[in-house]
Regions:
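A structural signal for beta-rich interaction modules in eukaryotic proteins
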Residues: 2-340
Length: 340
């Protein structure tokens, strides 16, 4: 089927064209992935957030500053750990401001996670809290599954020696090597908290000398496209034509009920910066959003751009054309894979 005229207008020489025109009729184009309400997990359906997802134009600057501060804090902390000293510059941390929740907050063991990407490594940081005062956990590690399937290799684990009522929280680090032949690995990882459990003697307040090996399964941890991207502000029109590789695909997103929802979802899913307030549609029917990011490639950070032309029809949902410019075809296809 043909792509709607609203999504098929030509680019200008200096960059993207202006907002598309309303279509005169006909069904939306179906080139690319067709993703409806029952489209399954992964891709854009996995990235749909609740109210307030994404960044609005009103709070973009504040959120960006907050993100940069948090990124700097992560970089400083990781640089202070001797085992990571040779890893070089931290390229991205995801999520930057608040970790992924891998357990419910009311459980006996609370686990959250950050994903830190370096040029040749990924470091998984697991924040672990023991809420049981009558139990001491020793030699706490996280056993990560699903690495081999993604072309990743675990190098070592930095455990937590002890979690007790005096020091209930700590951090486990799992160092993973990136395969140079698979520069952008995507994975769904299983996480098993493993430790020696010792009961505390109520009379002495000391742990029993003997304990037993125990483990606790948490939620899965996804490594996705956004984990390799860092938002960046730049001049979109000037940069667009300087990037040599390009790719474009059209998607019918029948599960998204508005252009506002589409913008919020894409900002969250791609991990890129919406430029010039383009994450806030002025027209409920047609809109163009421009995004910029730095992609964590094996050689360092590389600039990537995305232009999203969207059209909403109440009977069809949102039809979207995603066009990407990047230094390589591989990088372009990687960005598109966030939706496909």
């Amino acid at each position: 089927e043909s792509v709607p005229r609203a999504l098929d207008e030509p680019e200008t020489e200096s960059g993207p064209a202006s907002d598309p025109l309303l279509p005169t009729g006909g069904a939306p184009g179906t080139a690319g992935a067709m993703m409806g309400v029952d489209g399954g997990t992964g891709g854009i359906m996995a990235g749909i957030g609740g109210e307030g997802a994404g960044l609005s134009a009103a709070n973009t600057m504040g959120a960006e500053a907050s993100g940069l501060d948090a990124y700097a804090d992560h970089a400083t902390e990781l640089a202070s750990i001797a085992e990571f000293a040779s890893y070089g510059k931290l390229l991205t941390t995801s999520p930057v401001n608040a970790p992924v929740q891998l357990t419910e907050s009311e459980t006996e063991y609370i686990v959250t996670a950050y994903k830190h990407v370096f040029a040749e490594h990924i470091v998984l940081q697991y924040n672990v809290t023991n809420t049981l005062a009558e139990i001491v956990l020793e030699d706490v590690v996280v056993v990560v599954g699903g690495l081999m399937e993604a072309g990743l290799e675990e190098e070592f684990i930095l455990p937590i020696p002890c979690l007790s009522s005096a020091t209930p929280s700590g951090k486990v680090y799992v160092s993973i090597r990136r395969d140079p032949s698979l520069p952008f690995p995507l994975a769904t990882l299983t996480n098993t908290l493993r430790f020696v459990s010792k009961e505390v003697d109520p009379s002495s307040g000391e742990p029993e000398p003997e304990g037993y090996q125990d483990e606790y399964q948490t939620e899965e941890l996804d490594v996705g496209v956004a984990d390799f991207l860092q938002p960046v502000e730049l001049d979109f029109a000037m940069t667009w034509d300087t990037l040599p590789a390009s790719a474009s695909e059209t998607f019918a997103l029948t599960a998204l009920e508005s252009l506002d929802a589409s913008c919020s979802t894409l900002v969250e899913l791609l991990g890129m910066q919406a430029l010039g307030g383009t994450d806030v549609p002025a027209n409920p029917s047609v809109h163009t959003m421009m995004l910029a990011g730095l992609l964590a490639c094996p050689g360092g950070l590389e600039t990537v751009l995305a232009r999203v032309r969207m059209m909403h029809q109440p009977s069809e949902g949102v039809t979207m054309e995603l066009s990407v410019r990047a230094p390589s075809d591989e990088a372009c296809l990687f960005i598109l894979s966030a939706i496909a």
